[in-house]
Amino acid sequence: MKVWFAATEATPFIKTGGLADVVGSLPLALAEEGAEVSVILPNYGQIKEQYKLEMEFLFDFIVPVGWRQQFGAVLRLKQDGVTFYFIDNEYYFKRDGVIYGHYDDAERFAYFSRAVLEMIQRVDAEEVPDVIHCHDWQTGVLPAFLRIHYQHLNRYQEIKTVFTIHNLQYQGVFPEEVLGDLLGLSHEHFTAEGIAHNGLVNYMKAGLVHANQITTVSPSYRDEIMDPYYGETLEPVLQHRAVDVRGILNGIDYRQFSPETDEHLVENYDVKTVEEGKAANKAALQQELGLPVNPDVPLFGFVSRLVDQKGIDLLAHILPDLFELDAQFIILGSGEAEYEGLFQHASTIRPDKVASYIGFDVGLAQRIYAGSDAFLMPSRFEPCGLSQLISMKYGSLPIVRETGGLRDTVQPFNQFTLEGNGFSFSNYNAQEFLDAIKRTIETYHDKPVFKHLIETAMQEDFSWIRSADEYLALYRLIAPSAD
């Protein structure tokens, strides 16, 4: 089974969010399960020089973008059993700052999607993929290009596509002129059954309409986006293709996230030494952020973008109530100025209760996972979520809203059976969130029970192998002759 991943970010090369973790980790697990996996990425200027020095030039070629013919080159790097190809074009990808949000993103990612398909004509015959796995709106037009422009050609006739929705909120929506000018498509495709949506070209919808199979990053998110509340106006399209949509839970790379080996911690630990290890990390974290060093109060962590999707409005709403609790809170993140200012102010007026760090620091984030007793994730929606998986591995019990991947991974504590690996609340409601925090504090003071919960959480297995097996089964379903 030969699988190509077409994506716009992947660890360790370039990362802006959880997509990079998936594309950096899932191919490795697939390779371990016997698949031949390649990952195709843009060759951004932001990729570190150490990786660029390892890249090998393969060929240059011409890529059609609407009526234009644009230059491109392909470089290759092999790592951990996976081949990474990099599409090189200085105009589109050698830019300072962020990799998304440019005025010509419609053109940049149309170019990238065409380039991936044009590569197939140039690689050796034995490297032609059986399946191309596309990720989020940036590669949404690739399945459309394949079906409309390429499927009739030799080498392309048997290729199938999978399109994964990582976050339906971001859809890649552009003016109608993009259709012919950049995509080379006639107006017969600008319909409700095609890639038009609300009078605009929608790259996400292109993937939903034209891919052979569609996946989401958790089973619950798959069900949620069929409903208007979560469907971001695309629920009719998803309902129409419901039989082809499945939820496959993301995993976590425990080589990257493990308290046993994490170099950012003051003391490493495992499930057998968790009491001593977390106590040392908690004291160091309290001291680092200026909180009173007190082992007897529960310490809550929050590491996220400060935006409403992450439930930050709920946290802001209950902030005065948190001041009254016998607990401490650490907030790490950046986002909307209103929330940044609010939490900075809170840490100024109540330095005994709240510590805030506006921005992002990888090492500090890891120390929060290790030093906190519980971890806050009150998300409005969460396609999968990675932080709750990390926090469990580090013995910080997640407090989550029951949505998307949070519902699929966090089993709420049952005080009668002592089952569970965290705490949860159902409705997007500040009072329910506060009640969940209070339940956690109450349980924290029952030391044997709290230790049992921590041990349960740390022993959960959300590794990528299970996800890889599900994806392999999906690939074989649509390309049964590939093996």
UniProtKB/Swiss-Prot annotation:
Q: Which Pfam families match?
A: Glyco_transf_5 (PF08323), Glycos_transf_1 (PF00534)
Class of the enzyme per the UniProt entry, highest EC level: transferase
Q: Which residues bind ADP-alpha-D-glucose?
A: 15
Which GO biological-process labels does this protein carry?
A: glycogen biosynthetic process
Pathway, per record:
Glycan biosynthesis; glycogen biosynthesis
Keywords, A to Z, come to:
Glycogen biosynthesis, Glycosyltransferase, Transferase
Enzyme Commission designation = 2.4.1.21
Q: Which Gene3D superfamilies has this protein been placed in?
A: Glycogen Phosphorylase B (3.40.50.2000)
Recall the GO molecular function terms of this protein's record: alpha-1,4-glucan glucosyltransferase (ADP-glucose donor) activity; alpha-1,4-glucan glucosyltransferase (UDP-glucose donor) activity
Report which reactions are catalysed by this protein. [(1->4)-alpha-D-glucosyl](n) + ADP-alpha-D-glucose = [(1->4)-alpha-D-glucosyl](n+1) + ADP + H(+)
Q: Which family does it belong to?
A: Belongs to the glycosyltransferase 1 family. Bacterial/plant glycogen synthase subfamily.
Q: What does this protein do?
A: Synthesizes alpha-1,4-glucan chains using ADP-glucose.
Q: Per its UniProt record, what NCBIfam families does this chain match? A: glgA, PRK00654.1-1, PRK00654.1-2
| Protein known as | Glycogen synthase
Q: Which organism is it from?
A: Exiguobacterium sibiricum (strain DSM 17290 / CCUG 55495 / CIP 109462 / JCM 13490 / 255-15)
